[in-house]
């Protein structure tokens, strides 16, 4: 009995100390935004739903308002919720909020190099170069459009080969989207059955899946310890090395056949720039080339294929929407030519459907973490340099001020009274400010051309009753996952 009493007393004393330490931490934060009291080391981890962090964030903002602080383990994060707070930070204070925050899974691979996950002068130089180079290769222009059309033609042949049998469209769409960015980065496309290509897609998929999982969240919070422990993170570390080795080999292949007067792709352009900038502190070196190329490949492979896959599911759930898209395709494009990107200006309903698929899917509601680049005053709070920030882009996609029925799939959200496409300020699927997605114009073109080309050639059929379709993405940690399904592509 005495031993039990002493143990209970020790536990109570320990908890009391933890509470006192937490209160002390709150006081020394000064004018940081308010938030729930964190426990030492684990922060607010126990107060969050690990399977659905976005819902937990939404509940916290109802109590603390649109700007508040949470602790993810030892990491202190300021959360921005809603259009007004996000826009004020990322646009009105663009420079101050332009740093890249911590993402341990991707930092394991990129280590602060490359255009997407770097900071400071490195990020600025690489971003300027990448945007200019991608523009030179026709990003958003005719050159890339022809590559997308070619890839769309290959996809149509693959789908015709299924003869209307039920299939999981995931790998078909992943191969197609990845080949577009491959042609820009490497100057060539992969054969769809290429083992190296399939292995690459599998590894990237595993990294993305791990980053979104509850275990990935734990790794984000406690990576300094977990990287030495057994667990699924060890496979991610191995895959990261393999992905880097793959890209190094691609760069070496380009080096051996480089013509400085005739760049074939992004890698060539970077290599040529490296030759021009040979001073010691230049950011144009091999490590940044390898990691920037991997950045582009990651970003260009997953987003488009996931959006299309979810879009097909939604159209099967809403056959009236699919019918209207078919009607607009028949009226504007017909069946005797391939869709062109300029067609989107004459197809407001189809474009509204694509926008609504992006809004309703809301795959990454927490956005990509930012970091404060210098001491900043924001809405009466003081955010010291280095503070991590989560701009909750998902909160914009469900804001009833902009979308009348945010929980429903409804393309009318993007159409005015005359049936024309309308611009909605809160619709920011590619973020905004100085770190918006540099591939947004490519993604928009891919989504339109793949979507219309497929629907020009096929009708969609679900193998079971429409009531069996689960159209709601499943919360998975920091993200939302599309339900697995099969479908038939029925030739028209």
From Swiss-Prot:
In which tissues has expression of this protein been reported? Liver.
Alphabetical keyword list: Endoplasmic reticulum, Heme, Iron, Membrane, Metal-binding, Microsome, Monooxygenase, Oxidoreductase
Q: Where in the cell is it found?
A: Endoplasmic reticulum membrane; Microsome membrane
Q: Does the keyword DNA-binding apply?
A: no
Topology class, membrane: Peripheral membrane protein
GO MF annotation list:
heme binding; iron ion binding; oxidoreductase activity, acting on paired donors, with incorporation or reduction of molecular oxygen, reduced flavin or flavoprotein as one donor, and incorporation of one atom of oxygen
Q: Which Pfam families match?
A: p450
Q: Which residues bind heme?
A: 437
Q: Which reaction does it catalyse?
A: an organic molecule + reduced [NADPH--hemoprotein reductase] + O2 = an alcohol + oxidized [NADPH--hemoprotein reductase] + H2O + H(+)
Q: What is its EC number?
A: 1.14.14.1
Q: Which cofactor does it need?
A: heme
Answer whether the UniProt record assigns the keyword Iron to this protein. yes
User: SUPFAM superfamilies, alphabetically?
Assistant: Cytochrome P450
Q: Which GO terms describe its cellular component?
A: endoplasmic reticulum membrane
What this chain does, per the entry, is described as:
Highly active in the 7-alpha-hydroxylation of testosterone.
Q: Which family does it belong to?
A: Belongs to the cytochrome P450 family.
- Alphabetical list of PANTHER family matching this protein: CYTOCHROME P450 508A4-RELATED, CYTOCHROME P450-RELATED
Could you identify this protein by its name? Answer: Cytochrome P450 2A12
């Amino acid at each position: 009995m005495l031993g039990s009493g002493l143990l209970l007393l020790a536990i109570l004393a320990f908890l009391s100390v933890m509470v006192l330490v937490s209160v002390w931490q709150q006081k020394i934060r000064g004018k940081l935004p308010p938030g729930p009291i964190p426990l030492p080391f684990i922060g607010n981890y126990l107060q969050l739903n690990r399977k659905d962090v976005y819902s937990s964030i939404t509940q916290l903002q109802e109590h603390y308002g649109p700007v508040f602080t949470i602790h993810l383990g030892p990491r202190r994060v300021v959360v921005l919720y809603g259009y007004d707070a996000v826009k004020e930070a990322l646009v009105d204070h663009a420079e101050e909020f332009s740093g890249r925050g911590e993402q341990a899974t991707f930092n394991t691979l990129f280590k602060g190099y490359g255009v997407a996950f770097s900071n400071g002068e490195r990020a600025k130089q690489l971003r300027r170069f990448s945007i200019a180079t991608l523009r030179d290769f026709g990003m958003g222009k005719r050159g890339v459009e022809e590559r997308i059309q070619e890839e769309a033609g290959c996809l149509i042949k693959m789908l015709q080969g299924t003869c209307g049998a039920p299939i999981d469209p995931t790998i078909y769409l992943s191969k197609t989207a990845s080949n577009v960015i491959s042609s820009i980065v490497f100057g060539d496309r992969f054969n769809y059955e290429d083992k190296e290509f399939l292995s690459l897609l599998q590894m990237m998929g595993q990294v993305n899946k791990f980053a979104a999982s509850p275990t990935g969240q734990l790794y984000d919070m406690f990576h300094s310890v977990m990287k030495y422990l057994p667990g699924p993170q060890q496979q991610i570390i191995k895959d990261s090395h393999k992905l880097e080795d793959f890209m190094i080999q691609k760069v070496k292949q380009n080096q051996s056949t480089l013509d400085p007067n005739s760049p074939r792709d992004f890698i060539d352009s970077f290599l040529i720039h490296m030759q021009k900038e040979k001073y010691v502190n230049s950011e144009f070196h091999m490590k940044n080339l390898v990691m920037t190329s991997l950045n582009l490949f990651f970003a260009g492979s997953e987003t488009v294929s996931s959006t299309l896959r979810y879009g097909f599911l939604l159209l099967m759930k809403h056959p009236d929407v699919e019918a209207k898209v078919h009607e607009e395709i028949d009226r504007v494009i017909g069946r005797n030519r391939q869709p062109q990107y300029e067609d989107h200006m004459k197809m407001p309903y189809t474009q509204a459907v694509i926008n609504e698929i992006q809004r309703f899917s809301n795959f990454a509601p927490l956005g990509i973490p930012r970091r404060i680049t210098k001491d900043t005053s924001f809405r009466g709070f003081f955010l010291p340099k280095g503070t991590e920030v989560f701009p909750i882009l998902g909160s914009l996609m469900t804001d009833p001020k902009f979308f009348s029925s945010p929980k429903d799939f409804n393309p009318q959200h993007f159409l005015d009274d005359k049936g024309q496409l309308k611009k909605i300020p809160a619709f920011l699927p590619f973020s905004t400010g100085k770190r918006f997605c540099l591939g947004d114009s490519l993604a928009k073109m891919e989504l339109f051309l793949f979507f219309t080309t497929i629907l020009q050639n096929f009708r969609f059929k679900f193998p079971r009753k429409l009531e069996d379709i689960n159209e709601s993405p499943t919360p998975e940690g920091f993200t939302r996952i599309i339900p697995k399904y099969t479908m038939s592509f029925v030739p028209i």
